Amino acid sequence: MAYRKPSDLDGFIQQMPKADMRVKVQLAEDLVTFLSDDTNSIVCTDMGFLIDGLMPWLTGSHFKIAQKSLEAFSELIKRLGSDFNAYTATVLPHVIDRLGDSRDTVREKAQLLLRDLMEHRVLPPQALIDKLATSCFKHKNAKVREEFLQTIVNALHEYGTQQLSVRVYIPPVCALLGDPTVNVREAAIQTLVEIYKHVGDRLRPDLRRMDDVPASKLAMLEQKFDQVKQEGLLLPSALKNTNGNGVGLDEADNIGLRERPTRMIKRPLHSAVSSSLRPKPNVNDVTGDAGAVTMESFESSFEVVPQLNIFHAKDMDDIYKQVLVIISDKNADWEKRVDALKKIRALLILSYHTQPQFVAVQLKELSLSFVDILKEELRSQVIREACITIAYMSKTLRNKLDAFCWSILEHLINLIQNSAKVIASASTIALKYIIKYTHAPKLLKIYTDTLNQSKSKDIRSTLCELMVLLFEEWQTKALERNATVLRDTLKKSIGDADCDARRHSRYAYWAFRRHFPELADQIYGTLDIAAQRALEREREGGGGGGTGTGTGTAPETRRTVSRIGRTPGTLQKPTPSMRSISAVDTAAAQRAKVRAQYTLYSRQRKPLGPNNSNQASMTGAAASGSLPRPRLNSNSGGTPATTPGSVTPRPRGRAGVSQSQPGSRSTSPSTKLRDQYGGIGNYYRGATGAIPKKASGIPRSTASSRETSPTRSGGGLMKRSMYSTGAGSRRTPERNNPVRPSAAARLLAQSREAEHTLGVGDDGQPDYVSGDYMRSGGMRMGRKLMGRDESDDIDSEASSVCSERSFDSSYTRGNKSNYSLSGSHTRLDWSTQRAPFDDIETIIQFCASTHWSERKDGLISLTQYLADGKELTQQQLKCVLDMFRKMFMDTHTKVYSLFLDTVTELILVHANELHEWLFILLTRLFNKLGTDLLNSMHSKIWKTLQVVHEYFPTQLQLKELFRIISDSTQTPTTKTRIAILRFLTDLANTYCKSSDFPSDQSQACERTVLKLAQLAADQKSMELRSQARSCLVALYNLNTPQMTLLLADLPKVYQDSARSCIHSHMRRQSQSCNSGANSPSSSPLSSSSPKPLQSPSVGPFASLQSHHHQLSISSTSPRSRQSSVEQELLFSSELDIQHNIQKTSEEIRHCFGGQYQTALAPNGFNGHLQYHDQGQQDSCASLSSNSKTQSSANTTQSNTPESATMRLDNLERERTTQNAKSPTDDAKVITVSINMAENGELILASNLMESEVVRVALTLTKDQPVELLQTSLTNLGICIKGGNCELPNKHFRSIMRMLLNILEAEHTDVVIAGLHVLSKIMRSNKMRHNWMHFLELILLKIIQCYQHSKEALRDIDSMIPRIAPSLPLDLSINIVNPVIATGEFPTNLCAIKILLEVTEHHGSEITDAHLDIVFPNLARSADDTQSMVRKAAVFCIVKLYFVLGEEKVKPKLSVLNPSKVRLLNVYIEKQRNCISGGGSSTKNSSAASSS
């Protein structure tokens, strides 16, 4: 087709619609040439026609034509100037799309067009960037995002910060640091660097305040900023506006700063920099969306309605019918429909909804019409008016609108994604009104289903935002039915692909947590580490828009604001690489360091405690492994902190091997000292200053070895080399398992600091129970110096403990022992040096790191954290377990070795909470044993499995082992099978009782026995075959009847094979028995696995142990079945036991020397409820003076709640139980025989010393037998009431920890016994100076126990009047007042009763200020839904009335309703008559306290 070049614009406009591509290309070139020539006139018929003709070129698929169209627009902008502004709204969106073109030339022309718009004043730079930002920051095309960042940089360079405010763009730019595209991330970094050049150091704090900036990115940006500053690239605007940030610059710096011309710069080439971390962007809209409606516009429109002429109720019906017809007619004029929707609001304003048929009939009719509008209406004004009407209906009708909302909700949600902003925003606000006012549980299903299934990110993001409002506005009761669905939905949305949805979901999580803390913990435990950190940041930052507030139920441990960095990469760094051993004389360097440290230490050392005089190798408060130590700062007297520039020689001797050389001790422990953060030694520094590593696996001679052996270390007593706490102590498996119910968490939220204080120790005093008894209340007891009480030669330099090789086999689990340092004869207090990190969240971050050195530091710190007696919260524990699942197959040997230490420590602390994790633990350890390992690693895994044996219930272990063996989906290796069978054999032989064997004949048992029989006939591996046969025999020995039944169900072939194995073993055993000592057996195979008697054999009553009353040992000791000889010894002593019972009971009953009498009140409650029980019991408690040594004989005990050699048998149990069950018997006079020793100690019945009572009490936990707990607590109460309280004061914190644990028990009698002891403590003036520091914790714990049971409630009711005289007024009011205000029944009732009794006993001290504090809450309680709370509040107000007088209280009564005031007047009059009649004013108060 012939082409003729046009001569004017009208000619170009006429030819533009032509379809010939060649013509278009030529026409486009000619048009650009025409427009670029200033001599050519641009006058035409209509410039709009030219713009309309260029638009298809711009949006077409031909890149050359699109490029020419951009050039043509640029030329038009130059010619028209500001007149082009009329066309920017049409052109700009398509220019944005061309920014993402695949051709570089097209993108460049688009950039030039944007520059021309700013340069020729078509749009101011700020206005143009704002318009672009609304869509470019979140544009789906990565090229658009990248080019827009370049546009910001160009504009900034061209116009500077005077015309362009960049602060508003920083958050969305930071969000792009986590963009999936590498080029966008690089462009974002470059953009921030360019912004820094203009604004200077003001940018740094803004970036640090943004939690969504990954720490690695922040560190990179800081480095680039520093580089820019050092190179003098900062512009004058940055230096002028620093406002003091640049004060550090000297003249030379200023000279180096040069002005740079503000000109357009070429875009730098992108280099592929990978980013491994994806942030959670917190992108806020830069500007408001044009056309969007707001909540204010809704509110102002609610009552903008037409006036209705209503004269009769029928008129309203007529109007309603007209409205219904109009809004249902799709063909009606849209203005009429808008007016009809307004009339609906007008009818509601006139209370039309009060008519009975409105909700039942007319709302249903309206819902159908509204569904049609929301589904099919195209007019935005109609939909907007419908949304306003829906919002007003929800605000007016509230829950009556539930059926209506259920009908329209799904369609209303679908409008969120509408491209028209007015529709999307109106529907969103209508949804907010529905959530705020219509609390209908049936609506939640639609919310959650849509959120889970919607593919629109706008819908998901908005619904996540609405979830925050949902959890803030709705009551817990309305959410309970759908709690699990909400949990699953919230969990999914936290991991949503859209950043805004994730952000709102994190806010919603903390709001959800206030309703369901347990379910929130479940969500937290399933998240990965990054998501958990993001959650914590939202909580710390307070969230956005008031939605991210934290709650009292969240984890206590918070990261500090000033902490450096956020991830392991930016936290504490390890020291530089060590010098070679050949570089310096390492021995001299180390000895010099030791001398310097000791010199510093000797200036600060404290005298030894009274109980540590024998422990010469320990100093100060560190004499016992579990005692509190002064936390010395490394900069204030302790070991000086190592500077980054310092280096420390690193000896290259094999770990754990003493390599003495002629004339040298360079590898003795004194040369193993390390820097503060010098690697693995940080963990063990608290013990020895040396580095006790695992064995290297290199064969070594033991002929001249100084390695510890069981016959030398610990006084010749057997102990576990790795996890034992020393020859004189035994870490027991029973421990305080803190229960954290939501109610308790809410009640005790204010007292966590007090509970934390309890974990510090007894004011630095040595605790004589430390190292001998188990930890209680979260404080670890059970670390003492190895063998200090047994042997004095352990301090000698030649002793086994001092040798380096002994570390591998004798270091304690907590590593709190101090060893002699060879060559110097000095000892340092290594407790001043800590693990790399103390903050648990930092530790968890490091453990989750991908770098092995950071994981190592994290594991070291976590091990030390647990070893210090601290416990993890439920959230932290779940997070740690999730990380550990990945660490089980860690390929780095050093990290895995530390990991096993940490796992062991975790088991020791949290065994009771790891039952569900046991299957994973065993499976992973067995799989690891199936790989090729060093001998040292192999033995270490088995040591961990030994701890599993001892700290998990044997029945649970059997169940999980059967599950592992019978799992047909797994095909373990031969080595793995051998490890499993060996573990099972050891368990059955050593730890199980016959009752532990599953008795339900489950399929798992049958498959397990079948599998064992198959493996016992395996022909490939002799070792596997032998181990399988041993396992069969062990199980048969464990429970012969059950195994016989299981074997009978096997196929004939395997049945014969298994029986042959068992019979052959029986024959061997019978032969060995015939050749040895003949002893009767209790089962055919009782001698096949000899199990030594594990119960202690010390103390005067050790042999008087009935098989029914083995409270301290037999119920949990690691014996499966004792031989008949042992059983006969026990049975033969039954007569002696009964004789002793009767004799001791008679002595207690008839002995009157040194007695004190306690009369029980008629109701049986005066704080000594159990005396009449325990007075008839033989408290056979005997801890011999050398019990430390004797208890060490049982270091291999397992599953025992007590390791102390203690006997507390409850005699005449039936009588005790009967008495305990009837505490309201008639008044009885109880006599308890006590005497006083020369040293001031009490001597109770059966010569039980007060020190023994306290010692035993400190070992109590809530899971021990009820009779034992009652006996021990009763004895402790006697000592507190009748003694001088010297010992209870000395160990007050340990006693408090024990009592707090006891009060968590499930058994009511145990809780009551604990409350009695607590009552005596609070009534003891001698202990007042101690318990006053923990008053808040004590009162809140009492209030918490009030909801335990009816018996506990009655006991507390009788306890409150007795402790009230001792309570301080101000502090007590401050504690109970918040509980009265916010507590739930019955905790608020208990708080009111405490306030009533305090008012009764401290009436003269009450002031107007006190009345102002408590009266508003009492007034609200007077209208409580619970009648008992109302009654107690009324009695309390009456008491205040008489204490403070009518003139002060009566004005306050105005807040009460008239009926309540009349009721108060009745009670006041009755009280006044009672007082005038000579009655006591306490009667009514007592009635209130018992109501």
Curated annotation (Swiss-Prot):
Residues 537-586, 600-739, 1065-1127, 1167-1205 are annotated as: Disordered. It is found in: Cytoplasm, Cytoskeleton; Nucleus; Cytoplasm, Cytoskeleton, Microtubule organizing center, Centrosome; Cytoplasm, Cytoskeleton, Spindle. Gene3D superfamilies: Leucine-rich Repeat Variant. GO terms for cellular component: basal cortex; centrosome; chromosome, centromeric region; cleavage furrow; contractile ring; cytoplasm; cytoplasmic microtubule; fusome. Expressed in testis and ovary. PROSITE patterns: HEAT_REPEAT (PS50077). Residues 542-551 have a biased composition (Gly residues). Residues 1070-1097, 1111-1124, 1181-1200 have a biased composition (Low complexity). SUPFAM superfamilies: ARM repeat. The keyword Cell cycle applies. HEAT repeats lie at residues 44-82, 85-123, 163-201, 402-440, 874-912, 955-993, 1289-1327, 1408-1446. Pfam families: CEP104-like_TOG (PF21040), CLASP_N (PF12348), XMAP215_CLASP_TOG (PF21041). Interacts with CLIP-190 and microtubules. This is CLIP-associating protein. It comes from Drosophila melanogaster. The lineage of its organism: Eukaryota, Metazoa, Ecdysozoa, Arthropoda, Hexapoda.
